[in-house]
């Protein structure tokens, strides 16, 4: 076997991961932890793709709590010349190094035995689909525990290198309320202050709101901030104390009145869509942290939909893992 190192650099910030195959059993026994629900229709789409290609063509984005020795091994390996080095059309630099020395591979395997858990950062649907394809193939013919379908393609990144961006919300209407009624209602749970210019939240439990060509700062009142790992997330606070009770958004996964915009597109995208009349109000979020993500996964809980937006995205097609 060989490993690869995969580095992505975006806007001067680099993240360096190890490309490996991870075991479907470690997902099933919760050593590889999730923080999101998946949808059956999206899973099926990816199951069909993996089955038809007989391969994983896009890696799952996994993370782990930093281990100094692993960092040191990888730092030494990237002193060598990469086998790939290119800039994609989205201006992300991608570099790949090959690790084919047995002693280095064995060292990494031994060090990862000390890592208690891996966490899915991005790719919950692809991860669930890879596992289901493996289980399906186990049921067909004689089971071979070394067969490639028992494993799926992943890149493992140390948590301190990852960058979660804000994942912002747009709502089509004010649920039958006038602007004044809406502003009155939200002041029950939030301190509302009109601000000059765009407002990007700079601390947890604060939100930017764009309505009728004006920006507001919303500060959640202490009385609505829950103490559990999921309830205290800003996405939960906004959902439970504003989107559901005031705007009537029940299930954000299925409600057609809400849309989500990754922070990579900036606040200008929110302004554009509200000013065009397509949407009525926008909410700019403070990003979820890696610590929050891992705490929720460790508690065996799930985050609300659209809680995290990771950049840069891992590129499909650089690495391919054939299942047979």
Language model regions located:
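Surface-exposed, charge/polar-rich loops and edge strands
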Residues: 1-324
């Amino acid at each position: 076997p060989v490993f690869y190192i995969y580095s992505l650099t975006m806007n001067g910030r680099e993240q360096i991961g190890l490309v490996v195959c991870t075991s479907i059993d470690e997902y099933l026994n919760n050593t590889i932890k999730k923080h999101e629900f998946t949808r059956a229709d999206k899973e099926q789409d990816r199951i069909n793709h993996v089955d038809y290609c007989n391969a994983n063509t896009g890696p799952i984005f996994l993370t782990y709590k930093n281990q100094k020795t692993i960092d040191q091994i990888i730092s030494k390996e990237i002193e060598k010349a990469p086998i790939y080095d290119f800039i994609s059309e989205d201006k992300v630099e991608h570099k790949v190094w090959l690790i084919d020395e047995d002693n280095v591979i064995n060292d990494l395997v031994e060090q990862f035995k000390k890592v208690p858990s891996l966490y899915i950062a991005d790719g919950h649907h692809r991860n669930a689909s890879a596992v289901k394809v493996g289980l399906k193939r186990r049921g067909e013919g004689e089971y071979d525990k070394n067969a490639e379908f028992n494993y799926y393609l992943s890149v493992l990144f140390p948590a301190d290198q990852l960058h979660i961006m804000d994942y912002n919300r747009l709502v089509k209407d004010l649920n039958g309320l006038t602007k004044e009624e809406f502003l009155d209602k939200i002041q029950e749970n939030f301190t509302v202050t009109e601000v000059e210019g765009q407002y990007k939240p700079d601390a947890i439990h604060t939100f930017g709101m764009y309505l009728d060509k004006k920006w507001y700062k919303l500060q959640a009142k202490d009385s609505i901030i829950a103490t559990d790992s999921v309830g205290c997330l800003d996405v939960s606070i906004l959902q439970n104390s504003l989107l559901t009770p005031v705007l009537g958004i029940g299930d954000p996964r299925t409600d057609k009145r809400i849309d989500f915009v990754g922070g990579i597109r900036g606040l200008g995208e929110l302004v554009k869509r509200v000013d065009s009349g397509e949407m009525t109000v926008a909410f700019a979020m403070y990003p979820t942290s890696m610590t929050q993500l891992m705490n929720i996964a460790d508690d065996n809980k799930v985050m609300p939909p659209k809680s995290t937006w990771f950049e840069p995205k891992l590129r499909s097609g650089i690495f391919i893992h054939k299942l047979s």
